[in-house]
Amino acid sequence: ANNAGARKAIRKIEARTEVN
């Protein structure tokens, strides 16, 4: 399986944490 999807999701979560 490709980790691209997981990495994209993690980046999305990371961005959300940065906003907090």
From Swiss-Prot:
GO terms for molecular function: rRNA binding. It comes from Brevundimonas diminuta (Pseudomonas diminuta). Binds directly to 16S ribosomal RNA. Keywords: Ribonucleoprotein, Ribosomal protein, RNA-binding, rRNA-binding. This is Small ribosomal subunit protein bS20. Belongs to the bacterial ribosomal protein bS20 family. The keyword rRNA-binding applies. The gene is rpsT. One of its GO terms (cellular component) is ribonucleoprotein complex. It comes from the Bacteria.
